[in-house]
Amino acid sequence: ILQCLKEKKDEKNGFVFVVNLKDIKMINDNLGDRMKTYEALTTSTMLMPRLPVYVRLDGRAFHTFCRGLDKPFDMEFVAVMREVCQDLVKQTNAKLGYVQSDEISLAWEDMSKAPFDGRLFKLTSVLASMATVSFVLNCMKYPKLKEKVENLKPNFDCRVFQLPNMIELANAFVWRENDAARNAVSMVAQANFSHKELQGKSTAEMNEMLFQEKGINFNDIKPFLKRGSYFKRVNVMKVLDEETLS
């Protein structure tokens, strides 16, 4: 290890970087403490207290994964993403979950309600892993998606940020829902017109083309396809029989 650290040749520039080995302290009794200190410098960031928390998870390079799926909407893929969103809401106690296309949003009222005590590094790494596992397991129900999972190894990235108040948290969801509606119009248009016909067209113009030339009324498309789906945790009253209670 020390030899590797001592010399490193730069093949492009043809010179060697030398690390002074005297600066490397190999004291066994505090090595672990030092390494943990270095780790903490980049992994100990905490969210701010008493502020809403918003998480967005995106499928990485899902344009490749979705190639060859039914257009404009593949119902198996839609079903899988809805299941992933529900799984995340259940596992993280999120106040609200929202899914559109290959994207999932989660929210908590404040940092104290978020998982992992609001540790940013944990939130981003674990939530991305949870989404990936749920997606893969749910894809296994469908042969077409199962084959894609085996070939492409899909995964998710995750970003976390906070809003100054609950109104802005709600606006974050409005932002994503508006994006979903624009994308839905575009996807339906791309399934019915050539790239040349759509070039330079606005969302409103594509919507009008669909109605006038193809007889497709965007309002007739199912809401969860054109605007996404919301999931929330609710309290329910359940009557338990004696056998269940025993």
Where are the regions a protein language model picked out?
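Regulatory and interdomain segments flanking nucleotide-handling catalytic cores
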Residues: 4, 8, 17-246
